[in-house]
């Protein structure tokens, strides 16, 4: 089986450890983990720098895996990554990671599905950030993009399910 080139979207502060666990599974070939120092350097340069970093790292990736933690849906840059991926025609899928343990061995609460925040115009395939379709020509992104919610509470079982 050929490994996919993927871009991982996640809330860095809350879920970087969990994202590392998913990356280490080896099921897919993804981008190299960004260090907190690198991310802080990009953030310091402002919004345009962040957008360029995301756009560059998403290039040549065939899909985006949104690792859904407790606050992913509320994060500006996670939402930007979802919109950008859709506009670029990349596959988009979500995996709930709240039951994987973080670096301190703690699990989190389940977050909202970030795909619920977007609608797609069925005629033009245009993505817009709002929760409810404006008319019959729009569909909620959550009806298109699949999410995987491991049915386990024990972190090792969640890890095995994702694997």
Feature roles, as predicted:
Residues 1-63, 148-163:
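Conserved N-terminal substructure of TIR/SEFIR domains
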Residues 1-7, 18, 103-163:
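C-terminal interaction surface of TIR/SEFIR-family domains
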Residues 9, 66-69, 95-96:
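Conserved beta-strand segments of the P-loop GTPase G domain that flank and frequently precede/overlap
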Residues 13-15, 72, 99-100:
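Short, solvent-exposed loop/turn segments at secondary-structure junctions
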Residues 21-24, 79-82, 107-109:
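Short, glycine/charged-enriched secondary-structure capping and boundary segments
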Residues 71-87, 104:
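Conserved TIR/SEFIR loop-to-helix hotspot centered on a Trp-containing motif
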Residues 88-92:
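A short helix->loop->beta-strand "cap" motif at the edges of active sites that frequently abuts
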Residues 95-103:
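Short beta-alpha junction loops
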């Amino acid at each position: 089986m050929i490994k996919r080139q993927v871009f991982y979207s996640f809330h860095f502060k809350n879920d970087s450890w969990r994202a590392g666990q998913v990356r280490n599974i080896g099921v897919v070939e993804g981008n190299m983990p960004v260090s907190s120092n690198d991310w802080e350097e990009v953030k310091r340069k402002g919004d345009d720098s962040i957008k360029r970093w995301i756009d560059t790292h998403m290039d040549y990736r065939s899909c985006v895996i949104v690792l859904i933690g407790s606050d992913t849906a509320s994060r500006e840059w996670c939402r930007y990554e979802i919109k950008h991926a859709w506009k670029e025609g990349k596959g988009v899928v979500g995996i709930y990671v709240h039951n994987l343990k973080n670096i301190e061995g703690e699990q989190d609460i389940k977050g909202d599905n970030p795909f619920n925040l977007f609608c797609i115009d069925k005629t033009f395939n245009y993505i817009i950030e709002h929760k409810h379709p404006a008319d019959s020509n729009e569909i909620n992104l959550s009806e298109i993009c699949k999410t995987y919610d491991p049915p386990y509470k024990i972190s090792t079982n969640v890890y095995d399910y994702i694997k």
